[in-house]
Amino acid sequence: MRFCGTFKEGKIPYAEAEIVPYFLRFCELKGLSPFTVSLYKEKLDRFFRFLQGKTPVTSQDLLEFIGWLRERQPAPESQNIHLRSLKIFFRWAVAQSYLKKNPMHGVPMVRQRQKLITPLTISELQRLLDCARKTKQTGYRNTAIILLMVDTACWPGELCSLTLRDVRFEENLIRVDEKCGQRMLPISPSTRRALFTYLRRRKAFPREDAFFTTRHGTPLQVNNLQEIMDQLQRRTGIPRLYPYLLRHTAASSYLVGGADLETVRRLLGHTTYTITQRYVHLNQGDLARAQRRNSPVNQLR
């Protein structure tokens, strides 16, 4: 797909920052999700603000930006999100003949250690649900949120973007299309009941299309979701609790329960197995049980 802009081939009529809107429009036409386009915009804006109008961009500028980022966002993962956005942008700019050289060429990604994600235990999940159910005004909503995330491993942004049409009670399915492209995710009977129970009490806001709303009837946002988790964490005493951890917990549970990597990859909406493998976390008890179930030695007499 080639973007048709007003620039002439082989020329650089504007500073690199001025072609960012063309790049973002290209991404939209290509069908990338609003989440992805917004992410690119945020990271590119930050980089060009750092440059303060300097042009043309050089590899040295990019290395200095990495150093600047390291002081403010020490996590290598955060730095690499910026670098991936820049890499995609400059590759596009060269392919479209807006730039002759790619300043990202030879600039390495930041080395990051592989992290194992420790999921919530069944006991912690039960405490979380029990606490949510006791909340008078938002108990039905929060219960539905917890069950849906643990059942489907959906992204927080996908959950907040759900509309009334996306929840298909007759088919026991939800449709998500915020971050990883459109997917149809099955839901269990317990989750279906929780969603239906919440929906019956949500009728106070009949004109709002968003499935999950705040107490004021506005669509639930990811920051609202984090606030819900913060409140539940304080009440339950669970050491760590954030929306993504529910997704991690779901993915790990499916893998420990015997689901194959391809099934979990499709559930999570990942494009590669490398990302999915980060969710594989077996504690010693899980490992021992898996070994007893699957070792060929146990099949010998």
Question: Over which residues does each language-model region extend?
Answer:
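Conserved catalytic core of the tyrosine transesterase superfamily
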Residues: 1-301
